[in-house]
Amino acid sequence: MTTPNTAGINGGRAVHTKCLHRRESLIAFVLVLFAVAFNLYHLFPEVAVKVTDPNDTGMHLLATELAVEGITQGLDFTDPWMGSIGMGFPLFHYYQHLPYLSTALIHILTLRALSPFELVNWTTYLLLSLFPLSIYWSMRRIGFDQLSSAMGGLVASLTATDGLYGLDFASYVWRGYGIYPQLWAMVVMPPALAICYRVLREGRGYFWATLLLAATLMSHLIYGSIVFLTLGVLTFLPTTRLLTSEFPRVIWMRWKRLLILLVMVVVVTSYFLAPLILDQPYLNLSVLEDPRLYDSYGYSVLLPALARGELFDFDRFPSFTILLAIGFGICLRRWREERYLIPVAIFSLWLL
């Protein structure tokens, strides 16, 4: 029988726990809100100053206008002919085009309230600014607590590299490279990875996993491949069953789910992948592009750069690198919990 005194103590503990949870939620909300607000303020000149970008944005603008033309004129908007480049080129036949089609649809559905030029600038601005939300949501879906996820979102936009075409602002802003499709993939990739990981573990959620993974692939082929390879590594992370007879069965179950997911994504994107593979002999790589963009820089370059703090904090105090080292150590210390091994696996794999 519960005495009144015991009931009062239990009730007080419940109220205290509820207050702590609310406080944690408030702190997490403020941290993510600050990260987004900082990006919105810091990047506002990208849309406030209307000047032509001195980078690849010009080509992406042409592709967006081509998508608008294809949709409005009833043409095959998945494989139009771009006659404004050289003697003409079927860009969408060889190049991921979901970002262009999405921007074109926004332009049409908003009754052309904004020009394609303005839409490309505004979507770049908003996607970059909202990237912390993508990281926060994805970490929560993987199983991290609110504060850890909020801290991930807080620092998500703070990397600085020496022009490595990565996730930092230099890849997308006016003074950078203007890699518009990669920006879409960068924002969609974390949720895709989180949802797909849940499919591997629980065997449910195939629809959203297929949708997000296909969106990542059709925004940037390399980023879609990154998700698939990462999921292949994550199938080996059921550490709670590492020394039991269940381990092979769990691994096999996860691989079957990954293969099902792979087949579904290939079917959804086959309209693009099949012609791309069949017509691959006609696609040539530019001799002007650095081969390291495709082959990586190798350990001989990356490890010394990481040790010097230049890989994530180029030309500044290595604050992000220090936080990375601390987080890596915490994850290793908690290796028995599977979710903490996910950052370790991803970082170790793609340091290549």
Language-model features, listed with the residues they occupy:
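Membrane-embedded transmembrane-helix bundle of lipid-linked glycan/lipid transferases
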Residues: T2-T3, G8-L352
